[in-house]
Amino acid sequence: YAGLADKLHTDMHEVIGHASGQIEPGIGQPHETLKNYASALEEGRADLVALYYLMDQKLVDLGVMPSLEYGKASYDEYITKGLMVQLSRLKLGDNIEEAHMRNRQMIAKWAFEKGQKENVIEKKFENGKTYFVVNDYLKLRVLFGELLKELQRIKSQGDYKAGKALIENYGVKVDLALHKEVLERYKKLEMAPYQGFIQPKLIPVMKDGK
C-alpha cells in the first residue's frame, strides 16, 4: 500500500496542506511572527492535513484510493520514520536541525506521548530491537487532528512561544540509545540514508530534418 499512500500524502501536503488556513487580521506573516521555527511548523501543518485526510472514507468514495488500508500504511510509515528511520541521517549525539526532520519527529513524538494512556502507539521490544506499532488508527487520526488544530492556531495568531515549545520539546532532541540502535540496524542494510534525483539531459536526435 505504501507506493500510492506516499504519493497521496505528498499530493495533499503540497496542494491542500500548504494552501490551506488563514492568518488572523493584523497578524504578520509566519516568517515574521514564528521566525526560525516557521518552516518546521509549516511543514508539520501541511503533513498533518495530509495525514488527517488519508484516513477519510471520502477519499475511498471518490475513488482516490481503493481502501483505508492505504491510510493505515501511511500512518505506520510516518510514525516509524518520524521516531526511528530518519535518525539514520544524523551522527550519534547530534540534534535535529533540518525543518522536515524536526516536524516529523515533533508530530510522531507528540502523538506517541498524547496517546500513551490509551496505548494508541505502542513501543515494543523484540529480539533486542525497538518497534513502534500503531494499535488504533482512528484514535491516532483524532490526535493528528488535535495537533493540526493547534498548529493552525499558532500560525494564524503568530504564537511564537507555543510554536517554539512544540519544536524544542518534541522535534530537536534525540533519544541517544534509540539513535545508536537505529545507526547499527541501518548500517547492515548498506544503503545511503538519503536518496537523490538525477534529472535526465535530453538531446534531440534528428533524422531527415525532423
Regions found by a protein language model. Give the residues of each.
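Accessory "access/gating" subregions that flank catalytic or transport cores
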Residues: Y1-G3
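Non-catalytic terminal regions of proteins
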Residues: K123-K210
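Active-site recognition of the HExxH zinc-binding catalytic motif
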Residues: A5-Q22, A46, L51
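Long, well-structured alpha-helical subdomains associated
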Residues: A38, L51-I154
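Conserved helix-loop functional segments at active or binding sites
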Residues: G17-P25, M55-V60
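Post-HEXXH active-site segment of zinc metalloproteases
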Residues: G21-G44
